[in-house]
From Swiss-Prot:
Subcellular localization, as worded in the UniProt entry: Membrane
Compositionally biased tracts (Polar residues): 849-869
Domain Protein kinase: 566-840
Membrane topology value: Single-pass type I membrane protein
GO cellular component: membrane
Cytoplasmic membrane side: 536-878
Protein known as: Probable LRR receptor-like serine/threonine-protein kinase MEE39
Keyword Lipoprotein appears in the UniProt entry: no
EC number: 2.7.11.1
Main localisation: membrane
Keyword Metal-binding attached: no
SUPFAM superfamilies: L domain-like, Protein kinase-like (PK-like)
Length: 878
């Protein structure tokens, strides 16, 4: 039986490996590799040269047709160039890519015409990134194809790459690739960085790409006749932020004439271009005792380094220009010249040059872009012009839209939307209200049904609303009638089921009918009231839970939600439920408003589950529900505002600020454990959270931790034969209990497993799943490292050894016991809390001892938070 269990667990982790491998593509998180024109029904494939997984572009673009180069050319080119996508319809056709806002990306687009259409006319067209022009593609000049690269930081979570028709020929594209880079590399003062060249100095003929370059940059070999190539067989430490290929750093060039400069000259496409230089140096020769290699960097006669450059032996050094440079007349002359004290000539291993691409036009307001895209998706709108940025450039304004474009540096706003006669059906969705500057809305002559939503009255900029010719019903909201009296033009004619009068009671046809119907109706009403009273009394005597909406918690109207969020002005984040917005409650309390998206993957069921749970649980380490909104098709949860975000942001550095020290991390872990303990033993019935992870641990202004996101939580009976319940497996990969995954049997020990993974994340600051490791799962990786005896790799290096060793290793033992594959061998949360408090006591003792020996002026770059806890380990209600 034991062997069978291990077989199942092995299959589980193998399945996890396959899922991650498929999703990330050749072990590279964040890589997007699109083979343009590859049919959607063809599976992803591994490209033989690089080992990178390519897949179809079908899900990233709404338009275009697919083509294929002739068979005789396919064998001569990489597989991803065999197919292509071309765009005979429309002027601008755009890829829409999901990216991480503020992350540095290398974006590569490849174009190979190959006479796929038999016309033998190479196309010429423009390529845009967002609303700005990137470059012109002229395949008449480069018939063998071309590759364009740019390093760019997206301003939102959505990135558009657009192909723009500029003449008679038809735009096309062969491949589109995105590669995330380190955020502290390739920083431009403004704009983005267009690839000019990237070379390693060698007489080799091999183009270097992934996997030799972890970021999949392409390095071209280059050498001049007046240079000597030198090389080494020793490994060079290439681990700086730029991380150039090991192969490139093992080679270098020096001038043949030992007293000469190492000189490179190149001409810019545009004489006015500004450039950034990146040079990678490593000393790969063993120098004699009296030898010195030191040199200056001179660009067009100006020394641009502040002191002599001396490469270190077998270590990388990257020198770069922090400010953009210009070359007179567009001709750049760079020289490395040895200094007077140098006995050896200059040396260069690898070299990169980029030109600055200014992106002056701001993209349309992000909230409005999300809203109009959701409207497009909800109603299934298919318009060739509805691609790329909705408002800019002006010549590509979406059909039916008008925008306020006052200044290219300010985000445009949508002020008019005409969807008349567009075949719309369903209700008027709430996404319209996020168009906060909308002045005119025309939804006439469609098949819209349901009520006229009250949120239209809260859209203060609206001057004209045309809802005529639909199938709307019910009454017109009084607030909208009030706006009408203030000057709003409202047209609702042609909606047969819509009540236009103030009372919404049909006029009687005959007075005699009133005399008969009125008494009968009165008697019927009295009978109904009596029956309802008796029914309610009977129901109240039964031992059943109350309806979930009956609560002392505040129930807000949707208009109140809009008021507290200032019309959804400040998004805090986004999850499976929808967008979370910042709110202000009566000017006295900050709140977080979690709004259910119309296209939410969780939906109303999880919304209801979360409300039901939060209405009956009260604990200082569970996020506090201030109120909720359940109004027609509008659902929202209003929580207390947690000003320091989530734990994952602090561990990853995305939140900024100081590093969380070890004591603070233990504090957070204990508080999260207390919240779980309350769910497991303090609730009746007991609850399992099912989604314990670092993004669901929120931190207030004092870094006190609270557990959030209860949409997946489930109740269970403690003790007896029903201590486990069978459910559909849910949770987050990496944190998910493998035993629960295999059996679908849920218990509180599933949360314990997830907490163990969370604790490992806190200790190591490693990804929970990382395919670049030999053991991708964090628990397996820690076990592997411990067995190797190389324990220095385990603890987060950002702590710089500033912790009590016993405390850390005791916490590690707790984490590993929680993450035991067998649920019966895992501790309960009360035992976990006792052990973690012992860890905290050890750390506090170390701090007290150190404080006695430290000068009062000592400072630390780590964040210190005062830690205090009750000695009672039982859950305490607030």
């Amino acid at each position: 039986m034991k062997n069978l269990c291990w077989v199942f667990l092995s299959l589980f982790w193998f399945g996890v490996f396959l899922i991650i491998r498929f999703a990330e593509g050749q072990n590279q998180e964040g890589f997007i590799s699109l083979d343009c024109g590859l049919p959607l029904n063809e599976p992803p494939y591994i490209e033989s040269e690089t080992g990178i997984q390519f897949s179809s572009d079908e899900n990233f673009i709404q338009s275009g047709k697919t083509g294929r180069i002739p068979k005789n050319l396919e064998s001569e080119n990489l597989k991803q160039y065999a197919t292509l996508r071309y765009f005979p319809d429309g002027i601008r056709n755009c890829y829409d890519l999901r990216v991480e806002e503020g992350r540095n990306y290398l974006i590569r687009a490849t174009f190979f015409y190959g006479n796929f259409d038999g016309l033998n006319v190479s196309p010429e067209f423009d390529m845009h990134i967002g609303p700005n022009k990137w470059t012109t593609i002229d395949l008449q000049i480069v018939p063998d194809g071309t590759v364009k690269e740019i390093i760019h930081i997206p301003r939102s979570n959505s990135l558009q790459i657009c192909l723009v028709k500029t003449g008679a020929t038809i735009p096309m594209i062969s491949a589109l690739e995105l590669r995330p880079l380190a955020n502290d590399t390739y920083i431009a003062k403004s704009g983005s960085l267009k690839y000019y060249f990237r070379m390693y100095l060698s007489n080799a003929t091999v183009l270097l790409r992934y996997p030799k370059d972890v970021y999949d940059r392409s390095w071209v070999p280059y050498i001049q006749p007046e240079w000597n190539q030198i090389s080494t067989t020793s490994n060079v430490s290439n681990k700086n932020h730029y991380d150039p290929p090991q192969v490139a750093l093992k080679m270098a060039a020096t001038p043949t004439n030992l007293d000469a400069a190492l000189t490179m000259v190149w001409r810019l496409e545009n004489p006015d271009d500004q450039i950034y230089l990146y040079m990678h140096f490593s000393e790969i020769q063993v120098l004699k005792a009296n030898d010195t290699r030191e040199f200056d960097i001179i660009l067009n006669g100006e020394t641009i380094n502040t002191r002599g450059v001396t490469p270190k032996y077998l270590e990388i050094m990257t020198w770069l220009t922090t400010n953009p440079r210009q070359c007179n007349g567009g001709i750049c002359r760079m020289q490395l010249t040895k200094t007077q004290k140098s006995t050896l000539p200059p040396l260069l291993n690898a070299f990169e040059v980029y030109s600055v691409l200014q992106l002056p036009q701001s993209q349309t307001n992000e909230i409005e872009v999300v809203a109009i895209k959701n409207i497009r998706t909800t109603y299934g709108l298919s318009r060739i012009s509805w691609q790329g940025d909705p408002c800019v450039p002006k010549q590509f304004l979406w059909d039916g839209l008008n925008c306020n474009i006052t200044d290219i540096s300010a985000p445009p706003r949508i002020i008019s939307l005409n969807l008349s006669s567009s075949g719309l059906s369903g209700t008027i969705v709430s996404n319209f209200q996020n168009l906060a500057h909308l002045e005119s809305l025309d939804l006439s002559n469609n098949s819209l049904s349901g009520i006229v939503p009250e949120f239209l009255a809260t859209m203060k900029s609206l001057l004209v609303i045309n809802l005529s010719g639909n199938k709307l019903s019910g009454a017109i909201p009084q607030a909208l009638r009030d706006r009408e009296r203030e000057g709003l033009k409202l047209n609702v004619l042609g909606n047969k089921e819509l009540c236009l009068s103030s009372t919404c009671i049909d006029k009687p046809k005959k007075k005699v009918a009133v005399k008969v119907v009125a008494p009968v109706a009165s008697i019927a009403a009295i009978v109904v009231v009596i029956l309802l009273f008796v029914f309610k009394k009977k129901m109240s005597s039964r031992n059943k839970p109350e309806p979930w909406i009956k609560t002392k918690k505040k129930r807000f109207t949707y208009s109140e939600v809009m008021e507290m969020t200032k019309n959804l002005q400040r998004p805090l984040g986004e999850g499976g439920f929808g967008v979370v917005y910042h709110g202000d409650l009566n000017g006295s309390e900050q709140v977080a408003v979690k709004l259910l998206s119309q296209t939410s993957a969780q939906g109303y069921k999880e919304f209801k589950a979360e409300v039901e749970l939060l209405l009956r649980v009260h604990h200082i380490n569970l996020v506090n529900l201030v109120g909720y909104c359940d109004e027609q098709d509008h659902f929202a949860l209003i929580y207390e505002y947690m000003s320091n975000g989530d734990l994952h942001q602090h561990l990853s550095g995305k939140h900024g600020g100081s590093v969380l020290n070890w004591g603070t991390r233990l504090q957070i872990a204990i508080e999260a454990a207390l919240g779980l303990e309350y769910l497991h033993t303090g609730c009746k019935p007991a609850m399992v959270h099912r989604d314990v992870k670092s993004t669901n641990i929120l931190l207030d202004e004092e870094f006190k931790a609270k557990i959030a996101d209860f949409g997946l939580s489930r109740s269970f009976q403690v003790g007896g034969d029903q201590s486990q319940v069978s459910t559909v497996v849910a949770g987050t990969l990496g944190y998910l209990d493998p035993e629960y995954y295999l059996t679908s049997e849920l218990s509180e020990k599933s949360d314990v497993y997830s907490f163990g993974i969370l604790l490992l994340e806190i200790i190591t600051n490693q990804r929970v799943i990382d395919q670049t490791r030999e053991n991708p799962n964090i628990a397996e990786w820690v076990t592997f490292v411990i067995k190797k005896g190389d324990t220095s790799q385990i603890v987060d290096p950002k702590l710089h050894g500033n912790y009590d060793t016993h405390s850390v290793w005791r916490a590690l033992e707790v984490a590993m016991s929680c993450a035991n594959p067998s649920s019966v061998k895992r501790p309960n949360m009360s035992q976990v809390i006792i052990n973690l408090k012992e860890c905290l006591a050890s750390e506090n003792t170390r701090i007290s001892r150190n404080n006695q020996n430290m000068d009062s002026g000592h400072s630390s770059d780590q964040l210190n938070v005062t830690v205090t806890f009750d000695t009672d380990v039982k859950p305490k209600a607030r």
